[in-house]
Amino acid sequence: MPTIETMSCTTILVGKKASYDGSTIIARDDDSGSGRYDPKKFVAIAPKEQPRHYRSVLSHVEIDLPDNPCRYSIVPNVLPNRGILAEAGVNERNVAMSATETIAVNERVLGADPLVVLQPADEANGKPETPGGIGEEDIITLVLPYVNTAREGVKRLAELLETYGTYESNGIIISDVDEIWYVETIGGHHWIARRVPDDKCAIIPNQLGIDYFDFDDAFSDAREFMCSADLQEFIETHHLGRAAGTQGGMNGGHCNPRIVFGTATAKDHIYNTPRAWYMYRYLDPADAENHTPESDDIPWCLEPENAVTVEDVDFLLGSHFEGTPYDPYGTQGTEESRHRYRPIGINRTGHMVAMQIRPYAPVESRSIMWISYGSGAFTTSAPFYANVDDTPAYLRDTTPEVSTDCLYWTNRLIATLADAHFYETSNAVEGFSEDVRSFGHRLVERTDDALATAGATDAPSVTARLAAANDEMADYLRKRNTKRLGDVLYTSSNLMHNSFAMSDRWN
C-alpha cells in the first residue's frame, strides 16, 4: 500500500488591492518531506483526459465525476506512485487552485472528528477494506475542472469533504479574478473558509493559520467567511472553545480558529512561526517589530507597506532569513543561530507556482502561472500562460532520472553545485534571475499587445498564440540555464578541495 507522506509548504496570498497591478496572486512552495525529492512537470489536461470515475492511489476512495470538465493546466508530480498530486493549477475559466498547505489540528479536534484513514482488509476476520477520504493527491483533480468561480470551488470542495472526509489536515487555496479563498480542514469532515481581504496578504506556513472567524457572516451573506453548517455546535458539544481561556478563542459570534482548532508547539516555533515572521517582517516591517520568530500571534493576513509584486513573492518563497542571524548562508549570528529555524527556501522544494489572474487582460489570456522548479534560493520563476492545449517540452517532459534536457533536473544540479560556494556563484544566480524575469515581463507585454493588435477572439488562434509565447519563454530559459550551469560548474570546479594553483610550464 502506498505511504501517505506529509508535504512541507509555504503560502503567500495577495489580494487584488494589495498587488502591484490589481491582480489576485496565489503562490505556494511545494516542498517534499525531509530526504525526499519529487520531480515536477507542467502539463495541460484536456476534458477527454479527465477521469469520469476517480480512484485515489493513497486512500482508495472512489468517486464518480461529472461529465462536463473543462481544460486546465497543472504542475503535478512526475512519478505516479502517490497519485496525481496536481499541486497547482488554473482552468480555462480563470479559476486557480493551490493544494495543499499541510497544517495540523489539535488532539481535541481529532478526537471529536477523526481523520478518515484507509483501513486495510482484515482477511483473517473477514473484514473488507474501508477506503479513506480525500487528500492532497486528489483535491485539484476533483474540484478545478468543474467550477466557474472561487466561491463555487469552495462549495464543491466542502461537499466532497463532508461526503467523503479527509485523511489529513490541509489548507487549500482557490482564487479567481476578484476573490481569494483559503479553506482549512478541521478534523475528518469539518472545514472553515476565509476570503483574503482585497487590500491584504495572507502568509501561511505549515500551521493552521486563520485567526479570526465571523459566524454571523458565515451563516448569513457569507461575504467573507464560510464553514460547516454545524461548526458552532461542534465546538460547543466537544468543549473546543474552552481551551482558549481569555485569549479570544470564542467570543459571541466570532472565534479565533487558530486557538480553538490549531497547535502551538515547540516544533511550531522551529518549523513554522519563523517562516511567518520573516514574511511579515518583509511585507509590513513596522508592525512586525512587535513579534519574534517564535510568536504565536503573528497575524494570518496583513496590509503590506508597499504594493506586492511577483518579484516580492518570488523572493519570499525562496528566502532563507536574509539579513538576520538565522540565514544559513549568512555571516551574522552564530553557527547555531544560522541553523536554528527552517528557512522558506529549502533544498527539497519541488516547485514554486504563483498564479496571477489579471483583471485588465482579456478572458482568454488572463491567467499566468509563474513557475520555478527546485530550491528557490538558486533560481527564479518564469511566466507561462495557463490557457493552452499543450506545454513546452522543457517543463513538461521531466524524466524520473537526472537529465539536463529538462528544467527540473538542471535547476537541481545548479543548486547543488552552487550551495557549497554560495557567495562565489551568487552573481551567476542573481544575473540569471534578473534576466529571466525581465525577459518574462517583456514577453507577456509583447504577447498581450500582439493579441490586442490582431483582434483575435476565436479560441484556437488565441490558444495557439499563447502556446507559442510559452515555447519562447521555455527556449530562453533553456539557453540561459545552460549558460548558468556552465558558469556555476566552472566556478565550483576552481574551488574544489583538490584544486592546485600551479600549472605546468606549457600552460
Language model: regions and residue ranges:
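Histidine-centered catalytic/metal-binding microenvironments
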Residues: S433-N507
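Substrate-recognition/cap regions that form aromatic- and gly/pro-loop-enriched pockets
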Residues: E322, Y326-G455
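Glycine-rich, aromatic-lined ligand/substrate-binding cores of catalytic
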Residues: Q232-Y360
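Short, well-ordered beta-strand elements within core beta-sheets of diverse protein domains
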Residues: I140-Y146
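Short, well-structured alpha-helical segments that form the helix of a local strand-helix-strand
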Residues: G153-E162, V313-L317, T463-L466
